[in-house]
Amino acid sequence: MRMSLLFYRTSKNANKEASVLSYELLQKAGYLFKTSKGIYSYTPLFQRVILKMTEIIREELNAIGGQEVCLPLLQPAELWEKTGRWKAFLSEKLLYVLKDRENKAMCLAPTHEEVVSEFVAQWLTGREQLPIHLYQIGTKFRDEIRPRFGLMRAKEFLMEDSYTFSDSPEQMEEQYAKLRLAYQRIFDRLNLKYVIVAADGGKIGKGKSEEFHVLCSLGEDTICVSGSYGANVEAAQAIPPSYVYDSNLLPVEEVATPNIRTIEDLEVFFNTPKHKILKTLVVKTCQKDSEKFFAICIRGDRQINLTKVASFLQVDDCELASEEEILKHLHVEKGFIGPLYCPIPCYADETTRPMTNFICANNQKDVHCKHVNWGRDIPLPAFGDFLLAEAGDLCPQNGGAPYEIFQGVEVAHIFNLGTRYTESFSVGFQDKNGDKQLCWMGTYGIGVGRTLAACIEQLADNKGLVWPLAVAPFSITILYNGGDTEGEATALQLYQSLNTEGFEPLLDDRNERLGFKLKDSDLLGIPYKLIIGKSFQSTGLLEIESRSGEKCNVSPENLLDWCSKNLPCHTRKIPPLREQN
């Protein structure tokens, strides 16, 4: 492709909303333009990157028996109502909802578990057809409250989603392992640093679940890693530091604490460390339009993990109650809630079990108690694991070795769903006894745009984008000084030769200085530059420089040999951009 014909434009200034590097560079380099908040138009440059990314995905999924399908973006509410997810998604206000001319409720697809389950239910006639692995690569929609970070959190985005149906839990696990390995190969081909971590399934399902995270400083997710084991901080099992508490139980005392509401204030007021203070938080659950409130006690030096609390309470999710809700239901202000005389069900984290003579609130404004003890002053509660893991906590899955904490961008998520969806849609087969058996389902997804944005966050430098060779829009840029007629003639000849052989050259034929062209090539993230400079006239050698700065010289006669060893050939995979006369 000639740059003079390419539909693109670089920009010195990014959109004011470009708060992250990936969004800023994609705009500056002319890869995308903002259509509306969270909605973007892609230029031919970015479309080529996406085509290469999706080609890698197809190759790896086809290699394990995946079959590509196309599922509808417009989905009837009645399918979602069968699984109970219509109300759940509506409550989060993330669905794009509309009605057809018959007044039937529809949504724009955020995911396809319901649709594919109904699809397979119509097709499946016997056990011998299993396992089956269907996948698609298409657009998804989420009405994000705060779309931000460019492709990291958009309202419209591209995803690969796979669905497997099996005849048994064992076969489901086999399919899970195959997809997991295929996803690893996909990210390995991008040369990304990533980790696979245990995760919570959220609203999709409560079975086995893992996330793939690309490590980068921007990462919205906190990842706990110990040796080869990793987990999202919300799912990480951890052993926090333990402390020795008093064995001599002291008489409980009420202490006036005017306007002393926070753990930090209590630490100073009582001159005692945080781990000797009991912190009580009120959480709210909402199941079948019924709100319930619970008190959760944790050590004062730790943070609550609402995902673990929801799992303990056997609900889909929960949230911290607002100050208004606390005042309405407990008749006490936030900051003075405690397990003493608590009017709602109360549970405590395991790390609070050995605490003695601790400080806590007693549900009276401006009053706390000290020397409080379980069993004597407060009935012994049910205990559970309610803590967020932290750096230095010990990992039970890695022999008690400590966790390290990293930031990551979630780029893929894999789930074992069991029979949650297949039961709702009666997806099954008859066994040898004539009894109906349900299929066991798995769901898997890669965020294509998020993965490419994560590539940028991890690999970009102060010059611009740095695309992995596997997905770069062009492999090599041919550069010469504008106005150099001999250099232009050589460049055109080399361009035609490389183009014929399928090596995807980009010819910068603009009438610009060589230095200007070099900077643009770096900004675009093209892996290699083929430079026809002053030295070519004296030595007859071409200079090749990689995006990382490594240089070598080759003769025009040996250029194709160098390309065959260093560049991918995309003669059949990616259609060339059409050129004009």
Curated annotation (Swiss-Prot):
GO cellular component: cytosol
Keyword vocabulary terms for this entry: Aminoacyl-tRNA synthetase, ATP-binding, Cytoplasm, Ligase, Nucleotide-binding, Protein biosynthesis
GO molecular function, one term: proline-tRNA ligase activity
Secretion signal, residue range per the UniProt entry: none
Pfam families named among the record's database cross-references: HGTP_anticodon (PF03129), tRNA-synt_2b (PF00587), tRNA_edit (PF04073)
Top EC group: ligase
Protein's GO biological process: prolyl-tRNA aminoacylation
Localisation: Cytoplasm
Family: Belongs to the class-II aminoacyl-tRNA synthetase family. ProS type 1 subfamily.
Task performed by this protein: Catalyzes the attachment of proline to tRNA(Pro) in a two-step reaction: proline is first activated by ATP to form Pro-AMP and then transferred to the acceptor end of tRNA(Pro). As ProRS can inadvertently accommodate and process non-cognate amino acids such as alanine and cysteine, to avoid such errors it has two additional distinct editing activities against alanine. One activity is designated as 'pretransfer' editing and involves the tRNA(Pro)-independent hydrolysis of activated Ala-AMP.
Assembly description: Homodimer.
Protein name in UniProt: Proline--tRNA ligase
